Amino acid sequence: MTTQTAEYARSLITAEDFEPFVVGGEAIGEVHWIRTEGAEGATLVVGLWRSEPQSFPYPFTADETIHALEGELVIDLESGEKVTLRPGDIASFIKGTKSTWTVTQPFKKLFVISG
């Protein structure tokens, strides 16, 4: 459950508070939204995302920062570089980056999308 006022957003999460996360008409994992907009209409999205092992293309449609909480995720960038995220790792990607994500172990992240 998320509470959002003009001054802050606060969330308490249970398993039932996640919903399908849909990209390009396909559900890829589940999301719990903490915040869905910034001040004065600015793009600012914050949430938790979780997934069982799977692989899928993921275009970064805005700047995104990821803090890995559980499991392992391998992000293959179009440049050929691989970014592996495990609990405690933080990575930030710029808008327009094309990637393929491979969840190798059940994975959970906190994410912030801006731009």
Language model regions located:
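Short hydrophobic/aromatic-rich beta-strand segments that constitute the beta-sheet cores
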Residues: Y58, I75, K109-F111
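A short, N-terminal "cap"/entry segment at the start of jelly-roll beta-barrel domains
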Residues: M1-T43
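Short, conserved beta-strand element in jelly-roll/cupin
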Residues: S51, F60-I75
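Ligand-binding loop in jelly-roll beta-barrel domains
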Residues: D89, K95-G115
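Conserved short histidine dyad/triad with adjacent acidic residue
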Residues: T43-F60, I94-K95
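Short acidic-glycine-tyrosine-enriched beta hairpin
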Residues: S79-K95
